């Protein structure tokens, strides 16, 4: 059993923000694999089903980015999911736009959603970092992550999302380096 988590903020005006790339991945996963209708549970929107013959849960926390860990802890305790079986999709400033890097454990690199999850379940889970690039000045970081993708970026994002979803079998097997290189080289 696996838990996929997409990080984002739950307001309608945040839908196309760079910070909401995790939500977009969960939506694509739900659509591609025909997971159940999203239901409000565990302070998030929860779906369930099978991906590559593996039972999965997928959630978009409704607690806002900085409190995502609360939702995740409740869910893994209820379903008795090990932290090692959690895979989190999130934006990453330190990766070039469109690049993907999957890894197990490690630091939050200043990402508040990851810091919250670390606080509530520890660091031993997988992360799929999706590059949104860094703004030119440090002062612009908050504006950058909360800004909508532009039209060209949305087109690229569709391709990136498709590559990630098409490579799910590799991710489910937790071959994280192979997953990253496969997605980045499609």
Swiss-Prot record:
Domain of life of the native organism: Bacteria
Reactions catalysed according to its record: an N-acyl-L-alpha-aminoacyl-tRNA + H2O = an N-acyl-L-amino acid + a tRNA + H(+)
One annotated Gene Ontology cellular component of this protein: cytoplasm
One family name in Pfam for this protein: Pept_tRNA_hydro
Family matches, as Gene3D superfamilies: Peptidyl-tRNA hydrolase (3.40.50.1470)
Positions of transmembrane segments: none
SUPFAM superfamilies: Peptidyl-tRNA hydrolase-like
Record-listed E.C. numbers: 3.1.1.29
GO molecular function: peptidyl-tRNA hydrolase activity; tRNA binding
UniProt-annotated catalytic positions: 19 (proton acceptor)
Residues annotated as signal peptide: none
Site (Stabilizes the basic form of H active site to accept a proton): 91
Keywords: Cytoplasm, Hydrolase, RNA-binding, tRNA-binding
GO process annotations (BP): protein quality control for misfolded or incompletely synthesized proteins; rescue of stalled ribosome
tRNA-binding keyword on record: yes
CDD domains the UniProt entry points to: PTH
Residues binding tRNA: 64, 66, 112
Localization: Cytoplasm
Annotated site residues (Discriminates between blocked and unblocked aminoacyl-tRNA) in this chain: 9
Complex formation: Monomer.
Similarity comment: Belongs to the PTH family.
Job description of the protein: Hydrolyzes ribosome-free peptidyl-tRNAs (with 1 or more amino acids incorporated), which drop off the ribosome during protein synthesis, or as a result of ribosome stalling. Catalyzes the release of premature peptidyl moieties from peptidyl-tRNA molecules trapped in stalled 50S ribosomal subunits, and thus maintains levels of free tRNAs and 50S ribosomes.
UniProt-recorded name of the protein: Peptidyl-tRNA hydrolase
Organism name: Pelagibacter ubique (strain HTCC1062)
Lineage: Bacteria, Pseudomonadati, Pseudomonadota, Alphaproteobacteria, Candidatus Pelagibacterales
């Amino acid at each position: 059993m696996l838990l996929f988590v997409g990080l984002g903020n739950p307001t309608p005006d945040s839908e196309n923000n760079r910070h909401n790339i995790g939500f977009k991945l969960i939506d694509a996963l739900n659509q591609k694999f025909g997971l159940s209708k999203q239901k409000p549970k565990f302070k998030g929107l929860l779906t369930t089903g099978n991906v590559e013959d593996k039972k999965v849960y997928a959630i978009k926390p409704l607690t806002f980015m900085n409190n995502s860990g609360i939702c995740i802890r409740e869910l893994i305790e209820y379903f008795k999911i090990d932290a090692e079986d959690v895979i989190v999709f999130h934006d990453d400033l330190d990766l070039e736009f469109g690049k993907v890097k999957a890894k197990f454990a490690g630091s939050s690199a200043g990402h508040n959603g990851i810091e919250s999850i670390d606080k509530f379940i520890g660091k031993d889970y997988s992360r799929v970092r999706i590059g949104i690039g860094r703004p030119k000045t440090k002062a612009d970081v908050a504006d950058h992550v909360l800004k909508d993708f532009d039209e060209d970026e949305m087109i690229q994002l569709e391709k990136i999302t498709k590559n990630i979803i098409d490579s799910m079998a590799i991710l489910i097997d937790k071959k994280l380096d192979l997953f990253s290189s496969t997605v980045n080289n499609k």
